[in-house]
Design a protein with these regions (language model features):
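Surface-exposed coil loops of outer-membrane beta-barrel proteins
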Residues: 1-57, 66-102, 178-180
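Exposed, low-structure sequence patches enriched in small/polar residues
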Residues: 58-59, 63-277
């Protein structure tokens, strides 16, 4: 995740056939809860573990489908430590969610990704995700290159819908987070998001425009933390606009002179309007 803290991990990529590939990753995460008893100078944070199995199938030259199987595993609590369950190392997608039924030890996430290239210029993509097969979220979007005959131009639109119950485990210590930061999205859950992007390059000049609109619905900033007394529920809208204009002196080393303007409007904040140059 680009949003949470760095964490140690091991991973491997395996090409099973010309159409089938597999990604295996295991990581050690932290809850920002210190153990109450320690023999060291500083108490350790509570550890937990993350497993990811990602299977990708290229059905045709245009259609690609991927199955995501992720899980957060208990390694103890604030007092005791224990080895992670042996099923943590299992590489077979979906098996963990079936074989491990103890919600106090394991939190399961299952997702399905798909992308379809209509042509070299137009690509649609989407994603579905569910936690313990109880509730889910989805993403839909497309990218269009060289639209209207404009060379070196790209437009992208994307929509994300993530209910407030997604990524939250019945055992709060196993929620989908690391270091009190969400793994999947900067807002965690409880939001709708619309993303628009346009960029165009002419010779050495370029322009890049980004627009993001969040609609927060029953959102809690700390709901993915291992422990929180903050029960404040937030609803509202956040708008983010960014404009960048630049000139590339050397494309090989990306030597660029640019200027940018950022505008942010947040009706859930005490500082609703912010501008940056």
């Amino acid at each position: 995740s680009d949003n949470s803290l760095n964490s140690p991990y091991i991973q491997g990529n395996f090409r099973i056939s010309s159409k089938l590939s597999f990604h295996y990753m295991r990581s050690r995460l932290l809850n920002l809860l210190r153990r109450p008893f320690t023999s060291s100078a500083e108490a350790y944070y509570e550890p937990k573990a993350l497993s990811v199995n990602y299977l990708t199938y290229k059905a045709t030259d245009k259609l690609t489908v991927s199955l995501f199987d992720g899980g957060v595993w208990s390694k103890g609590d604030s007092i005791t430590s224990r080895r992670v369950d042996n099923m943590f190392y299992n590489p077979i997608p979906l098996l963990n969610g079936i074989a491990v039924s103890d919600n106090s030890k394991f939190y399961s996430m299952v997702g399905l990704n798909a992308s379809y290239s209509v042509s070299d210029r137009l690509k649609f993509y989407g994603q579905l995700v569910t936690n313990d097969f109880e509730t889910g979220a989805y993403q839909l979007g497309f990218r269009y290159y060289n639209f209207f005959g404009l060379k070196n131009a790209m437009v992208q639109f994307e929509y994300n819908d993530v209910p407030s119950s997604v990524y939250v485990s019945q055992n709060s210590r196993l929620s989908y987070s690391n270091g009190n930061l969400p793994l999947a999205h900067v807002k965690g859950n409880g939001f709708n998001e619309f993303v628009g992007r346009l960029n165009y390059e002419y010779q050495r000049f370029y322009i890049d425009v980004k627009f993001v609109l969040y609609t927060l619905i029953n959102h809690q900033n700390t709901v993915l933390n291992a422990y929180s007394n903050n029960k404040n529920v937030v609803s509202g809208k956040i708008q983010h606009q960014q404009y960048e204009l630049g000139y590339r002196f050397n494309k090989k080393i990306n030597l660029t002179l640019f200027g940018s303007y950022i505008y942010r409007q947040d009706d859930t904040s005490t500082l609703p309007n912010t501008q940056f140059f």
